[in-house]
Amino acid sequence: MAFGVEPPEHVTPWFKPVYEATFQFGGVAWTLCYILIAREGMRTKSYGMPLFALANNFAWEMVYALWVVDNAFEKTAMTIWMLIDTPIIYSILKHGVLEWQHAPMVSRNLKSILVGLIALCAAAHWSWQSWWIGNEMGKRDDLEGADLTQMAYWAVSMCQFLVSTMSLAMLCVRGHSGGVSWMIWLSRFLGTLIGLNMNYAWAYYTWPEAHEYFMSAPAVFVWGVTTVCDIIYGFVLYHVKSNERELSDGRKVAAEADDEQVGGWSKMKTGKN
């Protein structure tokens, strides 16, 4: 959302090329991540994006693609992400019951819960952008209206915060790597690190008066926790992969899962009692 903003003369001419290159790298990396999550979910009969994080990301893409962004690359990327989200959503609805057998109320109502979460998150994103733009938040002398770059920063940062923290929590709770892989982690980690954090860090370094919010206490907390969780995720993934079991149908289960649990999953899958 900053592609149309022209920096003042004192800002290095490298500002826009580096800013756009890092942003586009993030877009490509996250597109690859979504594709791999969809593929791995089908292959392992699981899903790799936490339920609330997926609902929030889908709602964000929908609201911003349809109503907020005007740059062609951003609009195209968000539309593509929405389309790629479809098989991920399918994986949750088809295989999520296997991951939620410990919570029957959730497993029986996954569809309703997902639809409700998407609606809730869409309302939140719509309210945020409507309030920000309507009140011209972040307005500066060199801007007409609200600072859309800052608005996008807070919205995207919270999306990534949820994905990073919840993905780590999901991996720890499951104890298996169903729906995820090394390439999924790497593309997600680098997409966020370079496409978001380094992107705005460069903007802050070269044009600090317009991007001082990047080093504010809330922002440092958000991108700091996001980065730490993404790094820790790699170590946890290694531990989980070293100890999990793969079943004959491609599903993965925690090393400590007993035969009764595995049998329960098979019954839930086939619908047998």
From Swiss-Prot:
Topology versus the membrane: Multi-pass membrane protein
Use of this protein: Ascofuranone is a specific inhibitor of trypanosome alternative oxidase (TAO), and quickly kills African trypanosomes in vitro and cures infected mice. As an essential factor for trypanosome survival, TAO is a promising drug target due to the absence of alternative oxidases in the mammalian host.
Catalytic activity: ilicicolin A epoxide = ilicicolin C
Reported phenotype of the disruption mutant: Still produces ascofuranone but impairs the production of ascochlorin and leads to the accumulation of ilicicolin A epoxide.
Transmembrane portions of the chain: 18-38, 49-69, 78-98, 113-133, 153-173, 178-198, 217-237
Keyword terms: Isomerase, Membrane, Transmembrane, Transmembrane helix
Localisation per UniProt entry: Membrane
Induction notes from the record: Expression is induced on AF medium.
Cellular-component GO terms for this entry: membrane
EC nos: 5.4.99.-
Function: Terpene cyclase; part of the asc-1 gene cluster that mediates the biosynthesis of both ascochlorin and ascofuranone, a strong inhibitor of cyanide-insensitive alternative oxidases and a promising drug candidate against African trypanosomiasis. The first step in the pathway is performed by the non-reducing polyketide synthase ascC that produces orsellinic acid by condensing acetyl-CoA with 3 malonyl-CoA units. Orsellinic acid is then prenylated by the prenyltransferase ascA to yield ilicicolinic acid B. Ilicicolinic acid B is further reduced to ilicicolin B by the reductase ascB.
Family affiliation: Belongs to the paxB family.
Name the UniProt record assigns to this protein: Terpene cyclase ascF
Organism: Acremonium egyptiacum (Oospora egyptiaca)
